[in-house]
Amino acid sequence: MDGLLVLADGTVFRGQGFGAKGTAIGEVVFNTGMSGYQEVITDPSYTGQLITFTYPELGNTGVNQEDLEADTPAVKAVLCRCLAPQPSNWRSSGTLEQWLEQHGVVGLKGIDTRAVVRQLRDGGAINGAVSTDGTSPAELLKQVLAAPSMAGQNLAERVSTTRAYRWSSPTAAAFDRRLQDQPVDRYRVVAIDFGIKRAILERLSAHGCDVEVLPAGSDADAVLALKPDGVFLSNGPGDPSAVGSGIALAKQLLSDPALPMFGICLGHQILGLALGGSTFKLGYGHRGLNHPCGGSGLVEITSQNHGFALDANSLDPQRVAVTHHNLNDRTVAGLELRDQPVFGVQYHPEASPGPHDADHHFARFINLMASRRNADKIERLS
């Protein structure tokens, strides 16, 4: 079946449809990773978006149950140059096309993805429509122009869990086997789910955390009632400045000067907003597996997926230290409080997909919780 991509500026790209038949409208973005398409498609941070893969081949390894970051795809549509008709991988349980059709996700193949990406790079991420049901370009453009911008949208509460639960890992996805052989103290961590990836939960667990997951709209009383050793603020989709409940929660928790806190991606931005900072929308975002980030004399190659960033000039330098920058455009990639055990990174140390350079941030979180526990013991003995 024939298909179309219609952008808000009126540009039309033609290709062949796959997956579910229908129309999807959302923000058109691109990911530059050469692998990990299943993790990307199921990452809740992509909610509401039409994802263009720059690597020309897609679907070569099929799909499986182990590489899901959520139960279902988060993206509204998938765009690619070439789709593999037959996967080749020992873990594959089906084709990407069948899986997308099963979950109602529209796909478009055979389009000039290089031209799409150049247009997004030069003009910025914009709304668009992918259609495989015969809807005319004129009608699609009308629907696209009526669709809301990603700016101002609180998507975190839409994708967050609706109930509290304790994480129990169904897979053995910890890539560092040394962690499994070491005796570790267990730490109780409360994770606020703004769209959390399973890989993050697995890395926290592998590093010695018993994780209690709470909905995005939780208040400080619900968090502190669980007597956490530390609090984790997760990744998630949408505009961070629109997540009012999350910002309010972070402000409340920051009033405890001894409570360790760690934020990733959206959670990092929420920390910055709670500290009086502001965010802005990036032109076309950072979405890929090889973004260099520098800080403290160390360069990490990182996995990233975000369309907003903290404004460094909005942060109080007397209280907040910017610890990392994205070395491609110098945007803020990490922060820490000078007088509290609180820090965040804009990228994904859990990878999935991507490099493992930044996994040490989980160990840092553990060390902060261990220091607090030891300080409490000394105080009780004195």
Curated annotation (Swiss-Prot):
State one molecular function term (GO): ATP binding
Domain spans labelled Glutamine amidotransferase type-1:
188-375
Its pathway is:
Amino-acid biosynthesis; L-arginine biosynthesis; carbamoyl phosphate from bicarbonate: step 1/1; Pyrimidine metabolism; UMP biosynthesis via de novo pathway; (S)-dihydroorotate from bicarbonate: step 1/3
Q: Where is this region: CPSase?
A: 1-184
Protein name, UniProt field: Carbamoyl phosphate synthase small chain
What keywords does the record list, in alphabetical order?
Amino-acid biosynthesis, Arginine biosynthesis, ATP-binding, Glutamine amidotransferase, Ligase, Nucleotide-binding, Pyrimidine biosynthesis
NCBIfam families referenced in this protein's UniProt entry, alphabetically: CPSaseIIsmall (TIGR01368), PRK12838.1 (NF009475)
Any single GO BP term: 'de novo' pyrimidine nucleobase biosynthetic process
Binding residues for L-glutamine: 45, 236, 238, 266, 269, 305, 307-308
Q: Which gene encodes it?
A: carA
Q: Which domain of life is it from?
A: Bacteria
Question: Where do the catalytic residues lie?
Answer: 265, 348, 350
Q: Give the family per the record.
A: Belongs to the CarA family.
Q: What is the organism of origin for this protein?
A: Synechococcus sp. (strain RCC307)
Q: What is its EC number?
A: 6.3.5.5
**Reaction equation(s) it catalyzes:** hydrogencarbonate + L-glutamine + 2 ATP + H2O = carbamoyl phosphate + L-glutamate + 2 ADP + phosphate + 2 H(+)
Q: Does the keyword Nucleotide-binding apply?
A: yes
